[in-house]
């Protein structure tokens, strides 16, 4: 309920990630919670690994909000498909997002010193991106191992920023 109250902010936006197979269910839940869906944004992965099936070279985020809409910061980058490299090599979380991708969305939809909430923070990429873009961050993760990984990554980003 704390997450729901936070997301209920009159100026808050939301961007839950989901697989294309779950998009209708996710969109339905978002609308039932009273959010207005603005766009479905697509992350096109530039460096996917081939498989026996169609490659999963895209992931989707549903950009939605409650209350008054906030305009994005970089109108020149207002397209709905964005290309970023996937994380190559060993990931610390199965759905880990590149920090540059998260920085892009965070910088485009918030201001410095705003607070970003990630109720499913996984390995903490959103938190690291917030540190690197001077945003406050609140994250939740139910898996203790991933919580510890995320905490360590965010603390390391904070220490690095203090040195710069």
Spans of features found by a protein language model:
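S-adenosyl-L-methionine
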Residues: 151-164
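Core catalytic lobe of class I
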Residues: 1-148
């Amino acid at each position: 309920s704390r997450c729901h109250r936070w997301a209920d902010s009159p100026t808050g936006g939301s961007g839950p990630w989901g697989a294309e197979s779950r998009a209708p269910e996710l969109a339905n839940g978002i609308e039932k919670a009273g959010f207005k869906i603005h766009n479905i944004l697509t992350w096109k992965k530039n460096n996917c690994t081939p498989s026996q099936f169609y490659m999963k070279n895209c992931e989707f985020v549903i950009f939605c909000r409650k209350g008054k809409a906030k305009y994005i910061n970089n109108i020149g980058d207002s397209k709905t498909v964005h290309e970023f490299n996937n994380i190559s090599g060993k990931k610390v979380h199965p759905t880990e997002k590149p920090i540059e991708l998260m920085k892009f969305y965070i910088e485009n939809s918030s201001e410095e010193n705003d607070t970003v909430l990630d109720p499913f923070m996984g390995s903490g990429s959103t938190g690291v991106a917030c540190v690197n873009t001077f945003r406050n961050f609140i994250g939740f993760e139910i898996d203790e191992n991933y919580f510890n990984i995320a905490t360590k990554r965010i603390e390391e980003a904070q220490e690095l920023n203090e040195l710069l």
